[in-house]
Amino acid sequence: MGTKKNFVIDTNVILHDYNCLKNFEENDIYLPIVVLEELDKFKKGNEQINFNAREFVRELDLITDDKLFTKGAPLGEGLGRLFVVAGVVDSPRVKDSFPERIPDHQILSVVDWLTEKNPKMKSILVTKDVNLRMKARSIGLLCEDYINDKVINVDIFEKSNEVFEGVDPSLIDRIYSSREGLDISEFDFKDVLHPNECFVLKSDRSSVLARYNPFTHSVCRVNKTKNYGIEPRNAEQSFAFEVLNDPNIKLVALTGKAGTGKTLLALAAALGKLTDYKQILLARPIVALSNKDLGFLPGDANEKVAPYMQPLFDNLNVIKHQFASNSSEVKRLEDMQKSDQLVIEALAFIRGRSLSETYCIIDEAQNLTPHEIKTIITRAGEGTKMVFTGDIQQIDQPYLDSQSNGLVYMIDRMRDQNLFAHVNLVKGERSQLSELASNLM
């Protein structure tokens, strides 16, 4: 490794990843006491940030010794030392520029103090707060984002599905007539295909929607399949149904802007496969309110979160409206809700549960951290399929972005696995006005 550095950690880094102390190699880490004070405010509650705060404090308690405040406590083999900076550190440079005594400015003071104390050693603030990084740079302090789980090139996940032109028309004819598809060796693809990648094959006179099946090493035709009254309106939606319906694909990511049909397609596919699962679970994170704010709303827990679950019920109503109100399909949906065979609820309510034989759909997954996504996936028991939907550019969490959110992180880590499939939906199917707003505003 290069020259050893000092890193000063902001509270939001810990709330994002409670294991962050293990990700700074042999460099030393400094923890301002004000960070511990801020963590104390987050320990109560059942959201992921509350869990992260508690876990970090527990980990800190295990490594605490008398040297933590003086010479630093060793973090383990291949890692540096951890220091807790107790008390208030005065920094004339910080005080002159930012006279208000708030936690952010106290953290900046620690960075400045370390810089003055060790002029030959880089001292760097690590924070996910963009404004705090701007303040640090304005007075000449080094700073950076926490990049351990960042995905560098997200553009590749937002492309339309590949269209391969100049394909031998006889191959396309054979794909149409073959149930098993054709061996991939018969095609001359320039790039290696990812497992379950969907694409269009075109010749000068015909075309076919296709998918690479990694289990049979074949290129198979994608059929236009209808699920519980919902019919795909374009090639991308056909691709989505293809991977949503395949029992061999246990993990699916559907991305795309608003109006592309991500959640509706996932729910329709789940309903179409009901005989294969004991339960359908549709959940989304509550982003707009913290736990404390949620408590001030009237009603019980379900009534408090109901407004944030409404978009999921709206998708269910779209499916119901495909049938007559007195039809067996609508009655079946209502019976499923009454018997908890179809459950729509806030993501926080399912934390800690083991999900077996469940078709689990997590909506707005771009608002989850990588650790949250991992935690949810590890809850999957036998016979469970997990689908994550979201727009990786529409982030509502203050310390996540298009490169660090859990959805894009999952796609990046899983895209070469046979059990995983990703489909990006580009074409909006709501209304002309909705499409115009998504593209221009």
Spans of features found by a protein language model:
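Conserved glycine(s) of the Walker
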Residues: 259-261
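Conserved P-loop
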Residues: 264-332, 397-418
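Conserved RecA-like ASCE ATPase "motif II neighborhood" in helicase/translocase motors
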Residues: 16-18, 338-361, 365-375
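Pre-Walker A (Motif I) flank of P-loop NTPase domains
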Residues: 247-253, 357
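Conserved coupling/interface region of RecA-like P-loop/ASCE motor cores
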Residues: 41-74, 310-312, 408-441
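N-terminal pre-P-loop "Q-motif" helix
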Residues: 229-248
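Active-site-proximal, substrate-binding regions of enzyme catalytic domains
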Residues: 3-124, 130-227
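Hydrophobic anchor at the beta1->P-loop junction of P-loop NTPases
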Residues: 254-256, 266
